[in-house]
Amino acid sequence: NEIKKISMMSKKDISTKELVYKFYGINNEYNIFELQKELGNKNYDKAFRISKYFSENSKKYPPQLIFASLHNYFLNLFQIKSNLKLSFSEISKLTGIYQEFILNDYRKVSVNYSLKEIVNILGIIKYYEGKSKGLMKDKYFDSELLQFISEIKT
């Protein structure tokens, strides 16, 4: 779809990055799935860059939705890590994930974290999710995602 849009533009229009970004988006690297992938692989530098972009664009990427997605990701990781001996169909029933390639990605990532680390991360996510929903009296909610990445990195 994006390639079709770009192909309809004149050659002089394509010469600026701004127009390509306008039709294609800032970057395919800046989405929740890439953030999850980078966190799963413990690539905190790239996760921090994505989080910084999300924080700077919090209307487009509300922290409440980001933290909910991260919670689901790490909860699925916990369930899969806890049940590595189960078959594909058993894990699918447990997690509600029926795409084998996604489950395989989770299995690969599961070696990067211990169960204790995952439980700790889930607790940290809940804390920052609460802050993003205004449950604490901190008004600096745009930086919560960056604080979260810094905290799980240590």
Which residue stretches match the model-derived regions?
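Small-residue-rich helix-loop
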Residues: 12-117
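Amphipathic alpha-helical interaction/assembly segments
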Residues: 2, 9, 54-83, 117-154
